[in-house]
């Protein structure tokens, strides 16, 4: 059986083997998953049902609390809460009827639905009984008020008639009415059935006295008393109706309590039942999962063992064959009996072994030829290396000479450039000096012109000074004559006595003015004389300055001519320096180009030398490798 299975699997591809193994594992995993899924689904369903049952229990508790609140308060708010709780419970029970499949729990739900129906009926009866009770309470109030009002009127009438005895009978009846009313009020507020008989007895006693009262009072009060008796009869009937309504309310409330207990018990029983079903489903799910897991492990281990043997054994055979090839043994061949990927691998190993036999045989012959060729190449390479080394030495000498020449050319170019710069600077300075000399000539010529103008102005000033002197002579003569006239006038005034005193004063003033004028004229004459003397000296100096200025203009013109000659000479020097610098730069460029070419030749020589050395080294290495290959090829057994 195993041989047939091994042979069948040996012809199946590894891809299908692995697919079969992993597919089986995946199918088993899927089976376990479906089993767990089914168990979890069942448990979740039971949990949901338990949750819904707990909701029924919650609504039942809320219904009980609402019923207790309504029993204590009897108001609209508590009534609305009770109706809401009952509606929620009925809706939840109807919902659960479509979810429960177990007959026992379904029967319990039917029981709960019936209990809800009875509870609703009892609740309706409770509301009707409460309505009748409240109506009876209203009748009690109106009947009692009417009877008391009628008795009060009779009392007031009897009191006004001063019928004391009759009034006392009416007061006694009124007291009995109040007593009966008090008993009824106690009964209606307490709701105790024992108080009902006490209240009825009090009403009957008051009613008997009320009916006997018309015989004790005037006949005019008989109608009022009859109406009061009728009202008290209605009062008694209302008490009876109140008692009946109270009894019906208590009975309905008791039925509600009983049905609430039924609802709660049914919910508890359903909770216990569903819990048992859930636990059973959980146990069943655990059992199924355990069985499925054990089966999956067994089948998985079996598949893993079979597939592993189908893969490992041929791999080990192939590995041993590869190790023989690695050790150099090419004498043996691998026998192939499979058609899967591993069989194809073994066939490839067989073909590789045969190919290696042929390859190693060919390599052995080629290695011998390589060794002899490497020895010849090594000898040629040594000769080439010696020639390249000689070329390298000569090239280094040429490169050194070119470097020295390049440095000298650079120095010449640098000196020519410096000389050109110095000539350019000298040319600029000469041009600047020529310009300054031209400006100096112009300034000196303008100065000479101004000196001539100043000399002419000084001559004119001298002429004007002479004119001022003649005018001053006239003024001086006039002042002397005025002084003489003033002196004569003073003498004549003195001769005239008192009559000429005023004229004498004027003559004195005129004489004094003439004397000051004469003194001022003399001072101006002295100033004019000094001015004329200074003007004469300045005119003499200006003549000398004009002569010197003319000499300076002539010298400056000669200096300008010399600077212009220097400028032309420096410009010529600058042009020649520029030509020298240009030639030096061209020579420098050519020298650098030659130097680069020589350096390239030297680099090529270095590269050639290095290549020759590397070729020689490679030749030696090739010879060594040939020997080594011969040794390696010798390790293989063909």
UniProtKB/Swiss-Prot annotation:
Domain Methyl-accepting transducer span(s) in chain numbering: 366-602
Predominant cellular place of this UniProt entry's protein: membrane
Record note on disruption phenotype: Deletion of the gene causes very strong reduction in the chemotaxis toward citrate/Mg(2+) complexes.
One GO CC annotation: plasma membrane
Keywords: Cell membrane, Chemotaxis, Membrane, Methylation, Transducer, Transmembrane, Transmembrane helix
GO biological process: chemotaxis; signal transduction
CDD domains in the cross-refs: HAMP, MCP_signal
Ranges for domain HAMP: 309-361
Pfam families associated with the record: HAMP, HBM, MCPsignal
Locations listed in the record: Cell membrane
Domain of life: Bacteria
Membrane topology, record value: Multi-pass membrane protein
Record-annotated membrane-spanning stretches: 18-38, 287-307
Family affiliation: Belongs to the methyl-accepting chemotaxis (MCP) protein family.
Function: Chemotactic-signal transducers respond to changes in the concentration of attractants and repellents in the environment, transduce a signal from the outside to the inside of the cell, and facilitate sensory adaptation through the variation of the level of methylation. McpQ recognizes specifically citrate and citrate/metal(2+) complexes. Binds citrate/metal(2+) complexes with higher affinity than free citrate, and mediates preferentially chemotaxis toward citrate/metal(2+) complexes.
UniProt cross-references to PANTHER family, sorted A to Z: METHYL-ACCEPTING CHEMOTAXIS PROTEIN MCPB, METHYL-ACCEPTING CHEMOTAXIS PROTEIN TLPQ
Protein name per the record: Methyl-accepting chemotaxis protein McpQ
UniProt source species: Pseudomonas putida (strain ATCC 47054 / DSM 6125 / CFBP 8728 / NCIMB 11950 / KT2440)
